[in-house]
Structures are given as structure tokens and as C-alpha cells.
Design a protein with these regions (language model features):
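Hydrophobic-ligand binding "helix-grip"
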Residues: 71-118
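A general secondary-structure signal for short beta-strands and their flanking turns/coil
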Residues: 9-15, 54, 72, 103-105, ...
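Beta-strand/loop substructures that line and gate deep hydrophobic ligand-binding cavities in soluble
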Residues: 99-148
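Hydrophobic pocket/interface hotspot
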Residues: 29-30, 77, 123
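Generic short beta-strand segments
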Residues: 55-64, 89-95, 125-126
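A conserved amphipathic terminal alpha-helix motif
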Residues: 136-177
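Hydrophobic ligand-binding cavity/cleft-lining segments
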Residues: 2-67
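Solvent-exposed residues in well-ordered beta-strands and their adjoining turns
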Residues: 19-23, 62-64, 80, 113-115, ...
């Protein structure tokens, strides 16, 4: 039991803001944000997204390598709407194919809000995990810096997708409605 209590815990976070100018139909943005499955599918890779019910999704985050370990995060995402806003947050998380880590916790709190000129949003992504035994010789600060860099990369990828795909999807939705 002693070894379990001596595990080194690592924690890292990343934050991104987004400001999207919408040229046409800005008044329809609040209604568009109510289309949860459509909006979440435009923000994330729809090939890795599985609807679980109203306001609930499973998402297989793009896998990545950290010091020769293949990391495959899988998260359950909750989605809520409030006035002119859509919020996404992680309700559950685990790592597929990495039995070495049993205390992985991924957090996400992302909000996208309809404004007069378009959409504004912010996402905070965080991870808390014990230092895997295979990586015990690597200084924790180096692991945390690497983890923070990976999270920033994930958020930048999502931001790029949102900037490109969300406006296209919104315009398509406007044509359909």
C-alpha cells in the first residue's frame, strides 16, 4: 500500500478563446446553438463522436504519444443550453489501452455564446493523473510541460476546426431553415 500513497500526481491545463465573426443571419445564432448534436458535431470530429442521448455524447479524443506511450483518451461529454449559449463539459473520462494508469481525470469546460457580431467562446481543458511507473525517471516538471503542450495542441486543433467548420455548418443550417 505504501507505493500507492507515494505516487506523484501530475496536473496541467490549457485555455483557448475564440471570437468568430458571422457575416449573415446573426439573429439565428441562438436557435442554431440549440441544435446540440449538430453544433457538437461541427466543433469536434463527427467520426469520433457518438450520441448517447439528449445532451450526452461519447468522444474518442485523437490519440497521441507521450515518451513512447500511446495515449487514447475517451470522454463522455455533457451539453447544456442556456440563453444564447451552449456549454460542453466532461462527465467521465478514461484512457483506452493504457492499463498502467487508473486515476486519469480529464476536465473540459467550454462555452460558446451568440453575440450581435457572431460567436464568442472559451475552453478550459485539464488533466490530473499519477506519474506512470514507466516514466518515473522523467522529472515531473518536464512531464507537466509536455502535458500542457499536448493540451494546447488539442485545443488549437479544436479551435481551428471550429473556425473553419462551425460557420460553414451554420450557413448550411440557415439555408435548410
Amino acid at each position: 500500500m505504501l507505493s500507492k500513497s507515494l505516487k506523484m500526481s501530475l496536473a496541467f491545463t490549457a485555455r483557448q478563446k475564440i471570437d468568430l465573426v458571422v457575416q449573415n443571419n446573426q439573429e439565428k445564432l441562438p436557435d442554431y446553438l440549440l441544435q446540440q448534436e449538430r453544433v457538437v458535431g461541427a466543433m469536434l470530429d463527427p467520426e469520433k463522436l457518438t450520441p448517447l442521448g439528449p445532451g450526452r455524447f461519447k468522444y474518442e479524443v485523437t490519440s497521441f504519444k507521450v515518451f513512447q506511450l500511446q495515449i487514447n483518451p475517451v470522454v463522455s461529454i455533457g451539453v447544456e443550453n442556456s440563453e444564447k449559449k451552449i456549454r460542453m463539459y466532461v462527465t467521465e473520462s478514461h484512457l483506452d489501452g493504457l492499463g498502467l494508469v487508473d486515476d486519469f481525470d480529464l476536465t473540459l469546460d467550454a462555452v460558446l455564446e451568440a453575440k450581435l457580431s457572431g460567436l464568442e467562446g472559451e475552453a478550459l481543458l485539464g488533466v490530473t493523473v499519477s506519474q506512470p511507473h514507466l516514466l518515473r525517471l522523467i522529472p515531473p516538471k518536464m512531464l507537466e510541460k509536455t502535458g500542457q503542450s499536448i493540451l494546447n495542441g488539442i485545443l488549437l486543433g479544436i479551435k481551428a476546426r471550429v473556425q473553419k467548420q462551425l460557420i460553414v455548418d451554420f450557413n448550411n443550417w440557415c439555408k435548410e431553415n
